[in-house]
């Protein structure tokens, strides 16, 4: 799948910040001159962190490529700031103390597994984001999450189950579907500051 250039990634982060600022101020934000890739369907997540402590402040996204990237980014950035049920809505002044991280996702693919041991072989920590599905339960973790928490593959899968509201060993004991995806990550180093691509 086509990757974003660094300039396109910077555009995504800047767009997310301005979009959130406008939403919190009651102003409608419209962009006329879009890079072509933003008109293509892509999955995307917006993650907000406090600065400088880098505590999670909100994270919501659209994992499937069901709408143009610009629309997914618009929806995910606003939702991360006001709709994450784990946190109160971000205040307009608070945004000055928040950094923004954008993850552009590849389409999720089913990890083919005949036994739970296959997951340990096929999933790579740091490369793969994961989605687990079991009945009506569903959970997602971005590829950067196990790196930030220093999890091994077993801990990653256990926490994926927890994210879905399932017991930690569900991936071993039940017939689950696990999907993997990769992401391209662009983030601010400080609020409204320098933007880098995480490699």
UniProtKB/Swiss-Prot annotation:
<dbReference type="InterPro" id="IPR027623">
    <property type="entry name" value="AmmeMemoSam_A"/>
</dbReference>
<dbReference type="InterPro" id="IPR023473">
    <property type="entry name" value="AMMECR1"/>
</dbReference>
<dbReference type="InterPro" id="IPR002733">
    <property type="entry name" value="AMMECR1_domain"/>
</dbReference>
<feature type="domain" description="AMMECR1">
    <location>
        <begin position="7"/>
        <end position="197"/>
    </location>
</feature>
<dbReference type="InterPro" id="IPR036071">
    <property type="entry name" value="AMMECR1_dom_sf"/>
</dbReference>
<protein>
    <recommendedName>
        <fullName>Protein Maeo_0138</fullName>
    </recommendedName>
</protein>
<dbReference type="InterPro" id="IPR027485">
    <property type="entry name" value="AMMECR1_N"/>
</dbReference>
<dbReference type="Pfam" id="PF01871">
    <property type="entry name" value="AMMECR1"/>
</dbReference>
<dbReference type="InterPro" id="IPR023472">
    <property type="entry name" value="Uncharacterised_MJ0810"/>
</dbReference>
